Amino acid sequence: MRLSLGREFVLFWSGQTVSLVGDRITVFVVPTLMIFALDASPFEVGVVSMAQYLGIPLLGPIAGVLVDRWNKRVTMLVCDLVRLAAIAAVPIAYWAGVLTTPLLFVCVALVSGATIFFNVGYLVAVPATVPQDRLVHAYSRLEGSRTVSEVAGPSIAAGLYHALGAAALLVDAATYLVSAACFTAMRPWGTATVHQGSVRSRLALGFRLNWADPVLRRVVVAAVTLNSGGPVFVTVLPVLAYQGLGVQVAAYGAAMSAAAVGAVLGALAAPRIGARLGLGRTMAWALLLHCLVGLGVLAAPALPPPVVIGVTIGCYGFFMSCINVCSAPIRQSRMPAENQGVMHAAFRTATWGVIPLAALAGGSAVTLLTPGLGVLDAARVVMAVGTLLAALSFLPALGIQPLLDRAERERVLNGSTA
């Protein structure tokens, strides 16, 4: 029986699905544009990749505090419009002949900043529009949309870049307009949940809540470890493909699209796996396997590079979907609604704050190693080191399921004695 998640969630889900396809276009086009149109070095690719996450350490600490005080729906609508303007500025600058790496850095950083506020509202939006007993199914659909966008996005992006060049980014700008229209059509929700307390006190509360809870603490440590190595792999991948392996844009786009089928399957399978094994156990093993399968990229160029990239990233995405579907319900189950905004913001600040440094480290390391090893071997070494570092995230995650089981036993016991 198919669960109904309600009109408000359907609007939210629809807007996000369209916008996510546009996001994948930008994620694909920006490094491609840099490498082929701006002749960027791996270091410059790493710098702009860093900008994608720069808003996290700069704005993350206060985003949750402020969003708790604001109307979430209106906040997310405004964020969509800001991102629309920033993305549209890139092709305009290119046509005017003034697009440079620093300007691209600024535009991407603006998108990053708006996305920080949007994502805090995003995590509050789902429980605000969906009943508690349907949260996992709602997140599964959202994760399915994310992974469907990864299937369609790269091939669409490759075709659009071939036909339009920098103008392909205007498609992403248009998707933000669609998302904003969906928010406008929704009934009012997401009013301010906190009206008292200073920004500093609320911020401190968010970090305390994440660290004081034993489950949240393990999730934080696992996520920090994952994000210390994973972005190295992701940042260096287009450098490996284009400059190291000589993969063409169309072939790379096709490989990424074909690979993302695995991520779609992960989003569909995660609720069933989580129900059978437990969310915590599923998350832990998904973390380990997500990282280890990344080593498969080392099979190129011995095997055809597009095939290797497609299969590797497909498995990579399958397990990432499992992680995402399991992580959010685990965290939300440990926190009351009035503190979820600040808790999520503190979580993102702590766990995503390392991503800019990891992305910069990946690009810098390839640049430093290339003179001695060549770009192919330099990229392979850096990606392998980043992947193995991320695999250590499995260790703290192993203890999550026993804590969840204990909490459930206590809940049942308290309910039976009430």
Q: What kind of region is each of these model predictions?
A:
Residues 1-418:
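Alpha-helical transmembrane-bundle signature of multi-pass membrane transport and export proteins
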